[in-house]
Amino acid sequence: NKRSVGSRTKICLDCRRIIETQYNKADLSIQDIASQLNVNRTYLTRIFKEYTSMSPKQYLQEIRMKRASQLLENTKESIKVIAYSVGFKDPLYFSKAFKEFYDKSPSDYR
């Protein structure tokens, strides 16, 4: 029972929409997204990667980093507040992930 191309495309688009609207939830997992879409996590990861060249987890991280960079540029919020507002539970881990993504610390980026 193979899913149609249209069905796989819709799953990928819905996955992107969920990530783009729920990225700020620290407990958002790819398993949660797969459950919301009524598909297996492994299947979701495979088809998402086919369509976007990145895993859902990588896309979630990218969305979080881009939103964090916007907040760093446009607000005076503390790095800690920004970390929490883009879905990180640990501001130190956020700073490390941000530096890996942008090759700059959040404070240097600002």
Can you name each region flagged by the protein language model?
Residues 36-37, 86-87, 98:
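Core residues of bacterial helix-turn-helix
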